[in-house]
Amino acid sequence: IVTAKYWHQAEDGGLHFTVAETGWAKASWGKIYGQWLIGSAVMVYDFDNFDPKQLTSVINHYGVTSFCAPPTVYRYLVRKGIPDMPTLKHASTAGEMLAPEVFHRFKEQTGLWLCEGYGQTETTLLMANFKGDHAVEGSMGTPSPFYHIELRGKNGKTVENGEVGEVVIIPEKAGRQPGVFTAYLDDEEQYRYVWRDGVYHTGDAAYMDENGRYWFHGRFDDIIKTGGFRVGPYEVENVLMEHPAVVECSVIGVPDPLRGQAIKAVIVLDTSYEPSLELELEIKNFCNQKLAEYKWIRFVEFVTKMPKTISGKIQKHVLRSQNESL
């Protein structure tokens, strides 16, 4: 109900469409049941290949009123031009970081606020920019009333506002929390690891501002450790997305004998640009002028497409595995 009514803002008599494989956990709590319970019909459309252009045709053909999709879909739309979607009243996104540029351009072209949310396969919706609260670009929003959430440091203690910590869930009852998974199939060791010290460890890093809003810093697996600093990839990616040549990007850490890890940008170019050394230097300079020196991009790779999940989420672990011996 929280997801459907207060994040997706699905309506009684409306038609909701979430881009999520129907075999996923999110399909049950973020695509079907909550929307039904508040009286909305549900658009179920599974596809073999990710095609954002096709999604807008579906929205208009069937008269979708509320829509949720990964940022990849919205990035494509603002780059290629958003067609008129007169029935669409509410738009939301989750799955990876949404660049501020995409947030603002979508608002300019449609008049709709993109409401970000955050959750995991192991949970339901944990945080979001909820109905009645002004959506803020880049923010995970505020916690769902269903959960007690804290940010904790390596010492297990709650961090101060503005400090990065791990998102953890404090269960209502000892060792149990409604809405959180109860086991990993055939992996009891991993289950005990994430449910340690009496709390559930998400593995996600974030910080909270003075207004109680949370901001994603990165998966701990994705955070780049370079020259003694810890860099969240999304800050660098947001700057990259401001360059007109960049359609998609993913920032990863690659082995570096001097720094431990160096920052590498994997980039899909707009069709009006061609890969070249000159363009690589231009993009590096464009970004590095806006970033602290320890966040500078050291390597660039141009690719024609990114490895993605069926819903369009970029798979950073695949990119990292391809660059282990760089």
Segments and roles (model prediction):
Residues 85-88, 246, 297:
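Core-facing hydrophobic residues within beta-strands of well-ordered domains
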